[in-house]
Amino acid sequence: MKLRLDKYLADMGIGTRTEVKKAIIKGQVRVNEETVKRPEIKIDTEKDHVFYQGKPVAYAEYEYYMLNKPAGVVSATEDKNDRTVLELIEEKQRKDLFPVGRLDKDTEGLLLITNDGELAHQLLSPKKHVDKVYFARIDGKVTEEDIRRFAEGLEIGEEKPTLPAYLEILETEEISEIRLTIREGKFHQVKRMFHAVGKEVIYLKRLQMGSLVLDPQLALGEYRELTGQELEALRDCSSLR
């Protein structure tokens, strides 16, 4: 892919187009072994080597991060009142990243951060029915009857019932622990489903989205780039090849 030098640097977060143009004109940018002072020259992202103030700037058209979202941050690109998930991604190069879908402010777990709009669309499309797996603690005893009702679909105040969901009881006491697989992503869906059977979610964590499984080595608030294998599997499960 070929890009103007100023766009290349702006895309990689060096600064605004105006700022990087000034840096180029001042001689702070080298392409391969030559200092370049023309912002408009074309860069081949696959062949050329760009340096800013002596440091290499590799071009990444898309970035993909797995985040273990902590409670207390919001799934948004910006927010006036709360810290956002993007503020946790300190090593990001691009400024156009966004969370794929959303987790409630008090919900923890797997969140994909990227700037790949086509992949995000495929993963979130209601036509794709990409599985999402959650662990939850529930106030009250979860029963076999609840399993049956979840499998049939529940009325949660929408035009249609939820799609069949797979509910697995891990522990059933006054505070139950469960694992739930749903195939859609309605607003507050897990909480509303349990409310429909007379119970309340007191803790919620997403473990998996499609083929992407939360890395158990990631502490809350930590993130890492997706591996090539993880990205390929995600594209497979969303039929994006």
Regions found by a protein language model. Name each.
Residues 2-241:
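Basic, flexible Lys/Arg- and Gly-enriched helix-loop patches that mediate nucleic-acid binding at interfaces
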